[in-house]
């Protein structure tokens, strides 16, 4: 009588290594879909502001959700502004106006100045 086929040994319980590829029945390997997030950028900004402070994965999830929400609001408002002015392109001017409309007082001023600085840096590096 033939011996039953042995399956691969189960990983140790304390193993921390993440499995990057899922095993299919026919032996082919399938890559997992990549989940895009702003976590790398949130972490970089955190280290600029508070070098000795860390962030939990739950807090990072909240920050990621926050950035996505603000992005959608600004993009939506900029789209509306372009539509009102019969334009088919969203420019930095629409983004700037959208930020002024969405963010309150001093926060809008700081956001506009940082945005202008970023656009200037980008255009000068081209």
Swiss-Prot record:
What residues bear N6-butyryllysine in this entry? 6, 21
Q: What does the entry give for GO biological process?
A: antibacterial humoral response; antimicrobial humoral immune response mediated by antimicrobial peptide; defense response to Gram-positive bacterium; innate immune response in mucosa; nucleosome assembly
Q: What is this protein called?
A: Histone H2B type 1-C/E/F/G/I
What is the organism field in this record?
A: Homo sapiens
Name the SUPFAM superfamilies for this protein: Histone-fold
Per the record, residues carrying N-acetylproline are: 2
Question: Where does the record place the modification Phosphoserine?
Answer: 15, 37
PolyADP-ribosyl glutamic acid modification sites are: 36
Q: According to the lineage, what is the superkingdom?
A: Eukaryota
